[in-house]
Amino acid sequence: MFSIQQPLLVFSDLDGTLLDSHSYDWQPAAPWLSRLHEANIPVILCSSKTSAEMLYLQKMLGLQGLPLIAENGAVIQLAEQWQDIDGFPRIISGISHGEICQVLNTLREKEHFKFTTFDDVDDATIAEWTGLSRSQAALTQLHEASVTLIWRDSDEHMAQFIARLNELGLQFMQGARFWHVLDASAGKDQAANWIIATYQQLSGRRPTTLGLGDGPNDAPLLEVMDYAVIVKGLNREGVHLHDEDPARVWRTQREGPEGWREGLDHFFPAR
């Protein structure tokens, strides 16, 4: 067990973890967010969402000014005080959103794979798919280094699609509800390691890390954490880690923000 007093970074997924998958409510986690804020412990949001979406949510959660990881690690939004770092305010890994769109359109036209991207529809349709407001749905379309899509083809064709993407230096990642295409060099783990190294360089000491997530695309993040909370989720595949030592990994009984709170309660029991 470790202490809330020691240098610590908390990395958290959003949908299905800190936010309820259906209502987007986060109130069960609010007391812990306040406690971490009072202890000057950064809560670093890490999601498949766009940086525009996440900056809005970051402000809503009272976490503004902190770094965040967007688009499954393809985009790192730097902390406000990191203005001297090259690339400020955002670091983007791999090829751009526009370049990925070109690849996908070519594959769809020439090899007849069936899928619908967020670029194929308007914000009203995305609002129906997600339950977001129109204004929030519009933020989901502001990708910089990935493409979000709904797969509408067979499992056999998906395997062929993934192989073609890999040949082209891209990866296909499953989220809680949607699929994401991004550069093969990008990932939540690489982005988290970069942020950890930056905090270490600035403070002179490596912080202890705790990660929370509920979906398969959170596994790379949780693998590089010192401690991990696997929040009970909706995805049938779940999250599986190479090292699930109970001293390091806790699987919650509750879902969403209640599971988030349960995970923090587990690793920081009341004194």
Curated annotation (Swiss-Prot):
GO molecular function terms listed in the Swiss-Prot or TrEMBL record: magnesium ion binding; mannosyl-3-phosphoglycerate phosphatase activity
Cofactors (names): Mg(2+)
Primary subcellular site in the record, as a coarse category: cytoplasm
Keyword tags: Cytoplasm, Hydrolase, Magnesium, Metal-binding
Catalytic activity: 2-O-(alpha-D-mannosyl)-3-phosphoglycerate + H2O = (2R)-2-O-(alpha-D-mannosyl)-glycerate + phosphate
InterPro entries: HAD-like_sf, HAD-SF-IIB-MPGP, HAD-SF_hydro_IIB, HAD_sf, MPG_Pase
EC numbers for this chain: 3.1.3.70
Gene Ontology BP terms: mannosylglycerate biosynthetic process
Binding site for Mg(2+): 13, 15, 214
SUPFAM superfamilies reported for this sequence: HAD-like
Cellular-component GO terms for this entry: cytosol
Annotated active site: 13
Subcellular location(s) of the protein: Cytoplasm
Pfam families listed in its UniProt record: Hydrolase_3 (PF08282)
The protein's enzyme class: hydrolase
CDD domains documented for this protein: HAD_Pase
Domain of life the protein comes from: Bacteria
HAMAP family referenced in this protein's UniProt entry, alphabetically: MPGP_rel (MF_00617)
Family that this chain belongs to: Belongs to the HAD-like hydrolase superfamily. MPGP family.
Protein name: Mannosyl-3-phosphoglycerate phosphatase
Organism: Escherichia coli O7:K1 (strain IAI39 / ExPEC)
Lineage: Bacteria, Pseudomonadati, Pseudomonadota, Gammaproteobacteria, Enterobacterales
